[in-house]
Design a protein with these regions (language model features):
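N-terminal nucleotide-binding beta1-loop-alpha1 segment
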Residues: 1-26
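Short catalytic helix/loop segments, enriched in acidic residues and glycine
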Residues: 27-45
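Short, acidic, metal-binding catalytic loop of nucleotide-sugar glycosyltransferases
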Residues: 47-54
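Short, charged/polar "capping" segments at the starts of alpha-helices
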Residues: 64-70
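Short phosphate-binding loop-to-helix
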Residues: 72-120, 131-132
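Short aromatic-hydrophobic micro-motifs that form the base-stacking/packing surface
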Residues: 121-125
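The conserved acidic donor/metal-binding loop of glycosyltransferases
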Residues: 126-130
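Conserved core of the sugar-phosphate nucleotidyltransferase
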Residues: 132-228
Length: 228
């Protein structure tokens, strides 16, 4: 597949907030879990700093805790990318939406409706992907066809992930998949999106809240919230 956005640059939102719909590990925000003495959110920032197609990085979450993590980890907030730390709101949707407005330099957070603003895309990145590489992000941003689409998300085929399955004598992990006609895929949570082009944004938080569809209760509640 050829590159379609090889020279475009995007701001990135790193979502590191917590709320009642977020999934915790050992009762802790995943962003602050440590591997080899370094928080997950620190790993992601280091990766994004090496991606050529990214301009500024906006990290949204518990501001005081994030500032302490970056201070302790000696993270330069101005080089090679400028890092903005944004206080979290009440849920994932509000975190992304209000951070996007900040990136537009809208001090009063009013929504601008010029065509250039409506076509402005941002990269949205999770805080719990410490193995993510700069090359992976660069490939995704350069191949996402934002000329013809308003939202592009990354997928990994089930076949590629079988290498991580438990094997004889070795631990591993199996994941839930999105099953479509072409194949079964795992969403990798890289999103390139034009927020002002997305209609019915109020459903985004509902989808996130009830995202674990193996829980039958979530399936029913999501259906009721949409059709009830």
């Amino acid at each position: 597949m050829s590159s379609v956005n090889s020279h475009k640059k995007y701001d990135a939102i790193l979502v590191a907030g917590e709320g009642k719909s977020s999934y915790k590990v050992h009762h802790q925000n995943k962003a602050f879990l440590t591997i080899n003495g370094k928080c997950l959110v620190h790993y992601i920032v280091e990766t994004l700093q090496q991606v050529e197609s990214i301009r500024d990085i906006y990290v949204v979450g518990l501001k005081d805790e994030l500032q302490q993590v970056f201070l302790t980890g000696h993270v330069d907030l101005s080089f090679p990318k400028r890092i903005h730390i944004v206080e979290q709101r009440s849920n994932l949707y509000e975190n992304v939406w209000h951070t996007f407005l900040k990136s537009l330099k809208s001090e009063n957070e009013e929504v601008p409706y010029t065509e250039s603003h409506r076509d402005q895309a941002m990269l949205i990145v999770p805080c719990d992907a410490p193995l993510m590489t700069p090359q992976e992000v660069e490939y995704f941003t350069s191949h996402a066809n934002m000329e013809n689409y308003d939202h592009v998300l990354g997928l990994v085929s089930q076949k590629k992930l079988k290498y991580f399955y438990p094997q004889e004598g070795k631990p591993g992990i199996k994941m839930a998949y999105l099953h479509i006609k072409e194949d079964s895929f795992r969403i990798n949570n890289l999103h390139l999106v034009k927020p002002l082009r997305i209609e019915n944004r109020e459903y985004i938080q509902k989808m996130y809240q009830y995202r674990y569809q193996r829980n039958f209760k979530n399936l029913v509640l999501f259906a009721l919230s949409i059709f009830g």
